[in-house]
């Protein structure tokens, strides 16, 4: 009887020990495998360029920043000078001051606009050094976010009709994608003239 009791106790002790070891190993196994943290995969440059090209199209950047040639349905972007900005030189015509208090005037290429602010000319956004070829990504984002010429803190404000307050609502990734695409565009060597003050345009 005593032997039977002793054997039973030994069996129970061994069983408890085995279960305890198994649970400890399982616990160690769980500690060895920390929960995986999901991270956002950064966009590749190729995917950024592709998205940037799409955004430039749907945002209508060619409407003002690409000079036009006459096509069968009217003015259309000149494929040889895409995003090269205003090319025709500064405004020389005198305008009626009463007219520009009511209307904004555009040239046929829609790269120049005249209004109460004077005459503004669409910037060269091509990859040429006379465009944004020498710009940094930070400059480009600052230009859009803050409405500053060339993204410089002490730069002049961007003038109408540039809709920078709307574009500023794009995400950082959107703006980085646009910049990546613009850096791949055909370079258009074209120095855009500075804005013309209103007093130089008004008929005396």
Model feature map: region roles:
Residues 134-149, 164-194:
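C-terminal capping alpha-helices of c-type cytochrome domains
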Residues 49, 62, 155, 161-163, ...:
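Interaction-mediating elements
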Residues 17-20:
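C-terminal motif of bacterial Sec signal peptides marking the signal peptidase cleavage site
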Residues 52, 58-68, 140, 178, ...:
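The canonical Cys-X-X-Cys-His
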Residues 70-142, 158-171, 201-204:
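Gly/Gly-Pro-rich "capping" loops immediately C-terminal to redox-active cysteine motifs
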Residues 1-9:
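Bacterial N-terminal signal peptides that target proteins for export
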Residues 22-24:
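Bacterial signal peptide processing site
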Residues 32-57, 69-75, 91-95, 134:
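Electrostatic cytochrome c docking/interface patches
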């Amino acid at each position: 009887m005593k032997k039977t009791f002793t054997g039973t106790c030994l069996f129970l002790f061994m069983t408890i020990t085995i279960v305890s070891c198994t649970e400890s190993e399982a616990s160690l196994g769980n500690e060895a495998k920390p929960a995986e943290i999901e991270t956002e995969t950064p966009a590749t440059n190729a995917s950024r360029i592709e998205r940037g090209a799409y955004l430039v199209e749907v945002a209508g950047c060619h409407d003002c920043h690409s000079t036009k040639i006459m096509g069968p349905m009217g003015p259309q972007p000149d494929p040889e000078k895409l995003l090269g900005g205003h090319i025709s030189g500064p405004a020389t015509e005198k305008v009626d001051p009463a007219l520009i208090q009511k209307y904004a005037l555009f040239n046929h290429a829609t790269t120049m606009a005249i209004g109460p602010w004077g005459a503004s000319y669409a910037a060269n956004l091509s990859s040429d050094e006379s465009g944004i070829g020498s710009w940094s990504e930070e400059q480009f984002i600052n230009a859009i976010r803050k409405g500053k010429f060339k993204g410089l803190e002490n730069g002049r404000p961007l003038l109408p009709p540039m809709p920078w307050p709307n574009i500023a609502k794009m995400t950082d990734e959107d703006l980085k994608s646009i910049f990546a695409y613009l850096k791949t565009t055909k370079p258009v060597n074209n120095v855009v003239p500075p804005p013309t003050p209103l007093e130089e345009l008004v008929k005396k």
